């Protein structure tokens, strides 16, 4: 690969081999004027540019010699009228005007009518050759047709926000020294701050440029997209030009005028999306020309602080701080912090005292080179918690729901807010409140004291609101697109929990996905395989109605692969597919006689009950299996008229995969459980099962944890039976669904896909749920569906699927090392649900939900294990975190007023030199201390 990084190597190369285009390599001698111009506007100190440098190849194909001639005579940031330029260039007005218009259209120059220098009292139009960054780099990348025709300008932009800064960033003082951009906080976050000054507020700048605003394309989003590192945001209209710059972007067809209210609406939408406000920072305290709404995954300006680990390049005068007592470790601030300054930790004291959390090293007293940089900042900033861990409930939940958060809101009687918080990760809380396997409760720290908090029952109470059209919660859409929704069509194949979760989060993001379901109604296994006495179908319908309200289309009775193919859907305009067809059928009972007429898959049995109303059973029923499906099958058999029901499983009684609740429900209904037995043979009479022989199971797994049951063949138990219902595995039925695609399969029949993105070998096809993981629970499928939505959004927008992606990895705090002062917590015993005896052994749910009084008592039992922790050394004071917290637990404080000192770029050394001298003194003192300590 040709060195495209200049004469000096950098540790952060632009990988040319990964680009979708070739960096130009001219076959002619370099043009000296372009070399001079490129060097002049970028000012890379100590570089003698060659044709291999970005300063040359970034301009060579766009800028003519005639343009370069004029630009070189203009000088950098020295405004001139056309009359002055006529004198300098010796050109006639008409050809010069035409050339200047072409240069402005291209983005090489700008113009304005201001008189800040006192040399333009009549406010004549003056032309300026700007710096490359911020300046012509943005202008060159603010027109999609230009980037498409000359993609090297995107690479030029990326290089010039890196190479000129490699050596200087550690020496930049607070305030940024007139270099690049400057973070300006969310205004609402500082509205009560008495010492806030005008230039720290968006409204101040908008009023300063009253009536002159224009929205325009984000050059960072557009250029990064061209480099194959897009973030999925729509690139249009995120950047707001103000003052004369608004006229420039409109007149050169880079933007359109907007009103004050429209500008404020864009800023609010940016905050909703977690974007950072930044103002230009090269003109001192009296002028800016743009306010950007920046996504850290693509922003070249934020990169200057994040990649070099030098926050002074960006930070505002404010620092976030958490009020620990209010914090509930919901993680919203963590997920949205652009700088990775907030992570989840714990409130609970340890036996060794309270945890002291580390702070990031800063360049103030340390020599700073590439070894100190944070090259992978976009991924590292998405680390969710400290190694010491956080709340076990959030960690254990596959969807990582903010359990501690919604318990707190419920305790305060804020049920709607609690429902909103749950649905950020789980669109089916009413469903899960009835069927979840409650891993959060298994992990609950309270369980080490007495009993776990009844988390799921509280969730069920909260989610009752979703069952009423008047009180259900329909989320506001948070769309990373300024004007309207996304138009790309996405198909969800399979209307189960994974598919519907994917559809929900795509709709929330601004899509109108279509769910294709082969059955007559959506819901998948929720509707057709979970008995209604556990999950009444009006509950599922109510939560599906929320999807309809969001704009999700359901096409039921359509089997993709049979009624319509993926190829045909592509012809209809579908750009992406999420395949979540589940495991629709049971496997075989692989023992002699296992194919007898009355040996039936438990899943097929339940589906027959729900889809075809097949409810007649006679005689003795034997259920084989120990999971939650086996419990459902056994209890359904009771309701279908079985004379008796017995359940046999390999595992010991305490190790049965079904939960304690399922086991007790079975026993309440007279189902006999025989734990530790495996099927040996089905004995038949006239082709039908009459008896089934079981042998004693001594162990289920080997030392490595692999399924390898060991039996005592001499210990046999016979079970007479009229019907055998086996629940020992499920399988996907693909048929012709994926015919003609490149999707590959695992030996067990599940689809192969990337474990992070769920993308298959066919790029536009993603998979999720049981069809990918094998048999799991509804909450696992729901979590996978949200990740599928994230991938599909990124994919159809042409973005990277992985960079800056939250991997949703959490660590459980060490409960054994937690110091819990039992006397300081509520000692009320765990609340219990009631039962409606009139509904016992019917197909209605006999469980009675908690009352409000029980919810209040139960939520008081939460120990409040987790909390967010801010590293002030990393915080850039953007205030995004404050917009996400529903508990007012994180606020901005004006602790760094020096960060609001703004310089003109021409005066940057006036700021840098004093700071550099002080820093060098600190470094030498630190080195002397280190040497002394070493002795």
For the regions a language model picked out, list residue spans one by one:
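Ferredoxin-like iron-sulfur electron-transfer modules
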Residues: 61, 91, 127, 278-291, ...
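A short, conserved structural fragment
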Residues: 104-117, 342-343, 890
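Beta1-alpha1 glycine-rich phosphate/pyrophosphate-binding loop at the start
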Residues: 401-404, 410-411, 452-456, 492-560, ...
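Glycine-rich dinucleotide-binding loop and its adjacent helix/turn
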Residues: 462-484, 509, 542-562, 586-640, ...
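FAD-site-proximal beta/loop scaffold in flavoenzymes
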Residues: 595-618, 702-775, 790
């Amino acid at each position: 690969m040709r060195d495209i990084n200049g004469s000096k190597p950098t540790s952060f190369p632009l990988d040319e081999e990964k680009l979708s285009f070739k960096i130009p390599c001219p076959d002619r001698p370099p043009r000296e004027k372009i070399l001079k111009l490129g060097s002049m506007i970028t000012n890379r100190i100590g570089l003698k540019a060659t044709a291999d440098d970005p300063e040359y190849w970034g301009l060579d194909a766009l800028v003519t010699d005639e343009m370069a001639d004029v630009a070189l005579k203009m000088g950098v940031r020295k405004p001139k009228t056309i009359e002055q330029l006529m004198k300098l260039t010796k050109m006639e007005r008409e050809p010069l005007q035409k050339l200047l218009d072409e240069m402005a259209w291209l983005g090489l120059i700008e113009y304005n009518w201001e008189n800040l220098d006192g040399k333009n009292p009549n406010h004549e139009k003056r032309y300026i050759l700007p710096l490359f960054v911020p300046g012509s780099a943005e202008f060159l990348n603010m027109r999609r047709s230009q980037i498409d025709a000359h993609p090297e300008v995107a690479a030029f932009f990326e290089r010039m926000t890196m190479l000129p800064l490699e050596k200087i960033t550690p020496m930049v003082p607070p305030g940024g020294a007139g270099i690049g951009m400057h973070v300006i906080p969310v205004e609402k976050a500082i509205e009560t701050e008495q010492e806030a000054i005008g230039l720290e507020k968006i409204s101040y700048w908008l009023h300063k440029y009253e009536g002159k605003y224009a929205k325009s394309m984000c050059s960072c989003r557009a250029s990064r997209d061209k480099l194959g590192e897009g973030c999925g945001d729509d690139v249009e209209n995120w950047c707001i030009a103000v003052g004369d710059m608004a006229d420039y972007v409109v007149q050169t067809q880079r933007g359109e005028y907007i009103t004050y209210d429209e500008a404020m609406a864009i800023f609010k939408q940016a905050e909703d999306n977690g974007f950072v406000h930044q103002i230009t920072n090269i003109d001192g305290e009296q002028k800016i020309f743009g306010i950007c709404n920046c996504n850290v995954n693509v922003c070249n300006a934020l990169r200057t602080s994040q990649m070099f680990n030098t926050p002074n390049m960006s930070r505002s005068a404010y620092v976030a701080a958490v009020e620990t007592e209010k914090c509930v470790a919901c993680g919203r601030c963590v997920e949205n912090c652009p700088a990775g300054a907030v992570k989840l930790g714990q409130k609970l004291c340890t036996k060794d005292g309270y945890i002291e959390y580390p702070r990031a090293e800063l360049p103030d007293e340390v020599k700073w080179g590439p070894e100190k940089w944070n090259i992978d900042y976009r991924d590292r900033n998405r680390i969710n918690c400290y190694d010491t861990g956080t709340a076990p409930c959030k960690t254990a939940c596959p969807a990582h729901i903010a359990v501690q958060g919604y318990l707190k809101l419920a305790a305060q009687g804020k049920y709607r807010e609690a429902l909103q918080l749950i649905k950020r990760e789980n669109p089916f809380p009413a469903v899960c409140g009835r069927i979840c396997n409650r891993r959060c409760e298994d992990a609950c720290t309270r369980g080490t004291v007495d009993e776990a908090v009844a988390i799921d029952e509280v969730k069920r109470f909260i989610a009752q609101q979703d069952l009423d059209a008047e009180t259900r919660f329909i989320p506001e859409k948070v769309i990373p697109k300024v004007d309207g929704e996304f138009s790309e069509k996405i198909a969800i194949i399979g209307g189960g929990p994974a598919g519907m979760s994917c559809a929900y989060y795509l709709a929330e993001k601004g899509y109108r996905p279509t769910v294709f379901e082969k059955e007559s109604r959506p819901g998948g296994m929720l509707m057709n395989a979970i008995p209604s006495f556990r999950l009444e179908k009006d509950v599922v319908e109510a939560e599906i109605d929320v999807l309809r309200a969001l704009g999700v289309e359901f096409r039921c009775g359509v089997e993709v692969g049979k009624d319509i193919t993926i190829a045909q859907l592509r012809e209809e305009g579908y750009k992406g597919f999420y395949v979540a067809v589940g495991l629709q059928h049971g496997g075989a009972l692989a023992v002699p006689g296992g194919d007898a007429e009355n040996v039936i898959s438990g899943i097929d049995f339940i589906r027959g009950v729900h889809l075809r109303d097949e409810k007649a059973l006679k005689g003795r029923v034997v259920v084989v299996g120990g999971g939650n499906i086996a419990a459902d099958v056994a209890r359904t058999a009771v309701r279908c008229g079985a004379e008796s029901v017995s359940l046999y499983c390999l595992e010991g009684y305490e190790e049965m995969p079904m939960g304690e609740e399922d086991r007790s429900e079975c026993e309440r209904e007279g189902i006999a459980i025989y734990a530790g037995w495996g099927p040996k043979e089905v004995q038949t009479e006239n082709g039908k099962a009459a008896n089934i022989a079981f042998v004693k199971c001594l162990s289920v797994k080997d030392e490595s944890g692999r399924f390898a049951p060991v039996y005592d063949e001499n210990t046999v138990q016979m079970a007479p039976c009229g019907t055998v219902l086996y629940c020992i595995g499920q399988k996907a039925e693909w048929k012709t669904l994926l015919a003609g695609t490149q999707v590959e399969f695992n030996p067990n029949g599940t689809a192969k896909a990337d474990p992070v993105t769920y993308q298959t070998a066919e790029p536009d096809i993603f998979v999720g749920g049981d069809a990918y993981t094998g048999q799991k629970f509804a909450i696992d499928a729901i979590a996978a569906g949200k990740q599928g939505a994230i991938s599909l959004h990124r994919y159809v927008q042409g973005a990277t699927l992985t960079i800056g992606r939250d991997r949703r990895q959490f660590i459980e705090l060490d409960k054994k090392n937690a110091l819990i002062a039992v006397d300081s917590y509520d000692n009320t015993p765990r609340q219990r649900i009631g039962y409606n005896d009139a509904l016992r052994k019917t197909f209605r749910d006999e469980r009675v939900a908690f009352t409000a009084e029980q919810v209040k008592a139960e939520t008081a039992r939460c120990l409040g294990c987790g909390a967010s922790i801010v590293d002030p050394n990393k915080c850039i004071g953007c205030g995004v975190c404050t917009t996400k917290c529903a508990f007012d637990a994180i606020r901005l404080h004006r602790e760094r007023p020096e960060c609001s000192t703004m310089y003109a770029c021409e005066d940057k050394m006036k700021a840098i030199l004093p700071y550099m001298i002080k820093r060098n003194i600190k470094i030498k003192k630190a080195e002397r201390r280190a040497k002394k300590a070493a002795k």
